[in-house]
A protein has these predicted regions:
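Short loop segments at secondary-structure junctions
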Residues: 17-20, 28, 97-102, 125-127
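Conserved hydrophobic/aromatic beta-strand scaffold that supports enzyme active sites
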Residues: 24, 93-95, 122
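Active-site-adjacent beta-strand/loop module that shapes the phosphate/pyrophosphate-binding cleft
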Residues: 77-108
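A short coil-to-beta-strand element that immediately follows conserved catalytic motifs
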Residues: 64-75
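Short connector loops at helix/strand junctions that flank enzyme active sites
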Residues: 8, 34, 39, 87-93, ...
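Nudix hydrolase/Nudix homology domain
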Residues: 34-36, 100-151
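Conserved N-terminal beta-strand and adjoining loop/helix that marks the start
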Residues: 1-23, 43-46, 90-91
């Protein structure tokens, strides 16, 4: 999970509920990342696959271990802060589906303050299109629509 040679690998999950809303976590981090919304996920442990890391991190950050992963939908490299250092992170995003509307995630700010997570919410695709807030990955609504076969 460390930033080895200023590179880090991470798995993330784009969780959709039955209404195709996507779960995002708000991170308040030092520059270069700053305040942004992103999918649950995090760094790989030694010997761990991207998908296994995505599942583990989703469970750690939300308590959910029953989200079905439907396959990889995106790869990206982005600049993050990790352990007080800027590093490049190679990320693989997996589409996940939950069969229920989940309204409670608990106090993520208290549980994950050390990770910079300060809030969570479900976003509709039109809300993602309209927001002026920074969303990672960029173009998330289009990625989801492409996977769901929508425009």
């Amino acid at each position: 999970m460390r930033c080895m040679g200023r590179w880090r690998r991470a798995g993330r999950v784009v969780v959709l509920d039955p209404g195709d809303r996507v779960l995002l976590l708000r991170y308040d981090e030092a520059p270069p990342a700053g305040r942004h919304w992103a999918t649950p996920g995090g760094g790989l442990n030694p010997g761990e696959s991207y998908a296994a890391a995505a599942r583990r991190e989703l469970a750690e950050e939300t308590g959910w271990d029953d989200v079905e992963l439907l396959g990889e939908i995106h790869r990206q490299v982005r600049l993050i802060m990790h352990d007080g250092r800027a590093c490049r992170q190679r990320e693989r995003l997996f589409l996940g589906r939950t069969g229920q509307v989940r309204r409670e995630l608990g106090d993520v700010a208290a549980m994950h303050a050390s990770d910079g997570i300060t809030a969570w919410r479900w976003w509709t695709l039109p809300e993602l299109d309209a927001t002026t807030e920074l969303i990672w990955p960029r173009g998330l609504a289009a990625l989801i629509r492409g996977r769901l076969g929508r425009r």
